[in-house]
UniProtKB/Swiss-Prot annotation:
Name recorded for this polypeptide: Clathrin light chain B
Subunit structure comment from the entry: Clathrin coats are formed from molecules containing 3 heavy chains and 3 light chains. Interacts (via N-terminus) with HIP1. Interacts with HIP1R.
Gene: CLTB
Cysteines engaged in disulfide bonds, as pairs: C198-C208
Comp. bias (Low complexity): 1-17
Region of interest called Involved in binding clathrin heavy chain, as start-end residue ranges on this chain: 92-154
Highest taxon, organism lineage: Eukaryota
Organism: Bos taurus (Bovine)
Keyword Lipoprotein attached: no
Length: 228
């Protein structure tokens, strides 16, 4: 082996004293020179090219790795789809969640509205009771006032009819006659009583409606009542 080292070293250096050099250093130098020759020698271009060609699929393998990463990414995303969906929902909930101040304000507003509703119901009941009481009092006062008016009207009528000029005016006679006739129930005199309440004096006034036909009908009924 020493001779081999010496041969290689002698072939490299071409000096006879190269056999005395360190064999390890000579071996390392030989290996480095061979490696340099392999890299720079044109005779080995094709293998280098073939090696480069073998190394060429590197980007393809990288692309396949990228594709695999993409596929794996899709698979990973699909596998973690529910988790990502839950995360998105949670994020949306956080975004749509009301702030604490608004939540407190809304709660206070709700309590305030409930208190107002309760107070309004109590007030409505009080107003109903008060209105019912006022209506009863008004009905009572109205009834008392009606009775007082009746009594006062009777007194006024009695005093009026006792006047000395009452007969001249004709109120008493007409009143008594009307009352007397109204109490009498004689068959066939109904239209006569109706005719007594009507004014058959013709009046030529533009503001009054023409009731001549009605007047003539009443007169005919008074003269010839309807036969039953």
């Amino acid at each position: 082996m020493a001779d081999d080292f010496g041969f290689f070293s002698s072939s490299e250096s071409g000096a006879p004293e190269a056999a005395e050099e360190d064999p390890a250093a000579a071996f390392l130098a030989q290996q480095e020179s061979e490696i340099a020759g392999i890299e720079n020698d044109e005779g080995f271009g094709a293998p280098a090219g073939s090696q480069g060609g073998l190394a060429q699929p590197g980007p393809a393998s990288g692309a396949s790795e990228d594709m695999g990463a993409t596929v794996n990414g899709d698979v990973f995303q699909e596998a973690n789809g529910p988790a990502d969906g839950y995360a998105a929902i949670a994020q949306a909930d956080r975004l749509t969640q009301e702030p604490e101040s608004i939540r407190k304000w809304r709660e206070e507003q709700r309590k305030r509205l409930q208190e107002l509703d309760a107070a309004s119901k109590v007030m409505e009941q009080e107003w109903r009771e008060k209105a019912k009481k006022d209506l009863e009092e008004w009905n009572q006062r109205q009834s008392e006032q009606v009775e007082k008016n009746k009594i006062n009207n009777r007194i006024a009528d009695k005093a009026f009819y006792q006047q000395p000029d009452a007969d001249i005016i004709g109120y008493v006679a007409s009143e008594e006659a009307f009352v007397k006739e109204s109490k009498e129930e004689t068959p066939g005199t109904e239209w006569e009583k109706v005719a007594q309440l009507c004014d058959f004096n013709p009046k030529s006034s533009k503001q009054c409606k023409d009731v001549s036909r009605l007047r003539s009908v009443l007169m005919s009924l008074k003269q010839t009542p309807l036969s039953r």
